[in-house]
Amino acid sequence: MAAKEKLEAVLNVALRVPSIMLLDVLYRWDVSSFFQQIQRSSLNNNPLFQYKYLALNMHYVGYILSVVLLTLPRQHLVQLYLYFVTALLLYAGHQISRDYVRSELESAYEGPMYLEPLSMNRFTTALIGQLVVCTLCSCVMKTKQIWLFSAHMLPLLARLCLVPLETIVIINKFAMIFTGLEVLYFLGSNLLVPYNLAKSAYRELVQVVEVYGLLALGMSLWNQLVVPVLFMVFWLVLFALQIYSYFSTRDQPASRERLLFLFLTSIAECCSTPYSLLGLVFTVSFVALGVLTLCKFYLQGYRAFMNDPAMNRGMTEGVTLLILAVQTGLIELQVVHRAFLLSIILFIVVASILQSMLEIADPIVLALGASRDKSLWKHFRAVSLCLFLLVFPAYMAYMICQFFHMDFWLLIIISSSILTSLQVLGTLFIYVLFMVEEFRKEPVENMDDVIYYVNGTYRLLEFVVALCVVAYGVSETIFGEWTVMGSMIIFIHSYYNVWLRAQLGWKSFLLRRDAVNKIKSLPVATQEQLEKHNDICAICYQDMKSAVITPCSHFFHAGCLKKWLYVQDTCPLCHCHLKNSSQLPGLGTEAAPQPPAGAEQNIVLQEGPEPPDHESPPGTGTQEGSGDSSEHINRGSASQEGAADAGEGPQIPEGEVCPVESA
């Protein structure tokens, strides 16, 4: 059953490719120039070419037929192709019969065939060919009435009966007319089939639109036609034909530089129409998806394909190529200029793929560094991929500077490549810190601050580079050629890569500064209080040799509570808000009210405390979230069962503000 479904899926794509190729040919065909050539040739007196408007209408009819063939259901499409194959077989039978009659006329032998070996060979060959044609037609049309397709065997039967050659010519014409009448009868009996199909399709479309809407109809057609795979196969067929036509006319092998130029020019030739450009877009998307999938497989093996929600990657690269092609008018350029521009666009796509590879590798590498996994092979794969992502973007930027004149798009490529290398450098630095901490007996103090400073340095460099790109783009727009699309790209780049990043970075800095001030304002627990409390930190589940006390009388490690406050300003246990006393109205400089001496030291909550890295603070990025992982907080975790002991004392309602005295 699976094999049948796969075969149907292959047929669903393969049978629709010719319709897109026909659309592509009709787009390339210039009817006006075609008729100008006809007027200058000897075909001008042909009645078929006297009616130009009829040919123009036939041009549009070709578009309609192509769209109909593209959207036909698979069952009807298969049936249509079977009818077409049957027509080809009948034409082949007609050709076999005509060639046989012509050969007999040239030989002028009218005697018994068994007395003439050449005549016998011709008869045997023609008979076998006609039998094969009749059998295939019967199988394709699924009928046992084989005589319907055997009219072209009449000249063979007449020759076997020693009929004169002049009469055999007449019999051959009769067989041709009989077969033509059969075809006309079949077409006439199915004349209303297209109308009925269109009527039923219209009724079904109206029902779907009324019930589900136009968006659901579009998604259904997209999935049924398998549009991405269909256009990718169409473009690959065009590209293969282009390569074949080149090598079939060349006798000498091409050099390496010539092969690279051939590759670019072939791609440029295969994106000269909107249909072929869409094919290139989907092909690039699938190539990017394949590269990113191989990247995950290299890092994680078969575990990469288990519950992977990000298998829709690759569309970013395809959309990028489409936007750049439309913005630069790619399909309107000459082949050489198109190949040059396409090389720049492909560089941008490669830079985007490298950035996506880094997005995949970054959390995996950091998680591997923070874990206790001793597998050298896993560490080798992670580090080798990071080294590749460190060296290759820098090499690509160097080659671009060597061979191209600098402009706005090349600056975007170079800046993206440099930022990718810098981000990989930061990832490797944090990975080395994790590995150093792994071999130490005690955790490294202020590790989260080091990670934050590393990420902050990278984010600052990224912000500066984005700002430089915007400044260069604005200057080029003002003093160079101004376009609406270019201005929109600069505006979008400024909003997402400059303004939003600046906001997130500043917000992250304020959160960390506020968390540090709050920790400094909390009292430090004495040794007597720790012995009396006799509990573990409710965040990292480790024994407390030093701790700070919240206004709600909860004990935490200062570092653990600081990480928690990076995310939210509530107590991890009772969830009351921790604010400075100066921020609360009516409190003035009075000391904050403290619970009674016998108040509970820990409160059993219905919800367990969330880890401090449960929600990544804005602007810190993936690396900081990985650095603040539970492996860093807890390097030999105790049992979670002792996280909180039930105690007696007043409950603090959730959401109540707990003032924190200013230091």
From Swiss-Prot:
Residues 587-663 are annotated as: Disordered. A motif (YLYF motif) lies at residues 81-84. It catalyses: S-ubiquitinyl-[E2 ubiquitin-conjugating enzyme]-L-cysteine + [acceptor protein]-L-lysine = [E2 ubiquitin-conjugating enzyme]-L-cysteine + N(6)-ubiquitinyl-[acceptor protein]-L-lysine. Its main location: endoplasmic reticulum. Keywords: Endoplasmic reticulum, Membrane, Metal-binding, Transferase, Transmembrane, Transmembrane helix, Ubl conjugation pathway, Zinc, Zinc-finger. It is found in: Endoplasmic reticulum membrane. Induction: By high-cholesterol diet. It holds the Pfam family TRC8_N. The keyword Zinc applies. Gene3D superfamilies: Zinc/RING finger domain, C3HC4 (zinc finger) (3.30.40.10). The active site is at 537. Disruption phenotype: Knockout mice generated by CRISPR-Cas9-mediated gene editing are born at the expected Mendelian rate. Compared to wild-type littermates, mutant mice show slightly reduced body weight and increased serum cholesterol levels. GO terms for cellular component: endoplasmic reticulum membrane. The keyword Acyltransferase does not apply. It is a multi-pass membrane protein. Its EC number is 2.3.2.27. GO terms for molecular function: transferase activity; zinc ion binding. A zinc finger (RING-type) spans 537-575. InterPro entries: HRD1_E3_ubiq-ligases (IPR050731), RNF145_RING-H2 (IPR047823), TRC8_N_dom (IPR025754), Znf_RING (IPR001841), Znf_RING-CH (IPR011016), Znf_RING/FYVE/PHD (IPR013083). The chain crosses the membrane at residues 53-73, 77-97, 123-143, 146-166, 168-188, 205-222, 225-245, 275-295, 316-336, 340-360, 384-404, 410-430, 460-480, 482-502. Interacts (via YLYF motif) with INSIG1 and INSIG2. This is RING finger protein 145. The lineage of its organism: Eukaryota, Metazoa, Chordata, Craniata, Vertebrata.
